[in-house]
């Protein structure tokens, strides 16, 4: 995957989970990308199943503080039918697409 990202020469968006160890995994992923010349523009936190709201809020703040990369969205667990099209539309409702593109394009 690293070679692919380097070949397409586009910035990355890291999708991190919100569970135990998520801060460490987000930091390691962002640092790995940086070491390989891949710019990470944003983090999206997904899979917040069974995460205490206070801990989730502090995890998001810590991810931003330790990586210096903004968290653009926190997507809560999906609770509907298991249909990809429905899930995608549902997830989009939590992501500010204008903010996402402005961040990726550096606007």
Residue map of PLM features:
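Inter-motif core of Ras-like GTPase G domains
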Residues: 1-19
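C-terminal lobe/tail of nucleotide-utilizing enzymes
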Residues: 31-107
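Active-site glycine- and acidic-residue-rich loops that bind
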Residues: 20-22, 52
């Amino acid at each position: 995957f690293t070679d692919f990202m380097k070949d397409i020469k586009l910035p990355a968006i890291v999708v991190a989970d919100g569970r135990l160890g998520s801060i460490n995994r987000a930091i390691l992923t962002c640092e790995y990308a940086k070491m390989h010349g891949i710019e990470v523009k944003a983090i999206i936190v997904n899979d917040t199943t069974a995460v205490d709201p206070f801990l989730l809020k502090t995890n998001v703040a810590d991810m931003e503080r330790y990586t210096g990369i903004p968290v653009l969205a926190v997507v809560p667990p999906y609770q509907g039918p298991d249909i990809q099209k429905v899930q995608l539309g549902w997830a989009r409702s939590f992501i500010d697409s204008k903010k996402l593109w402005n961040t990726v394009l550096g606007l």
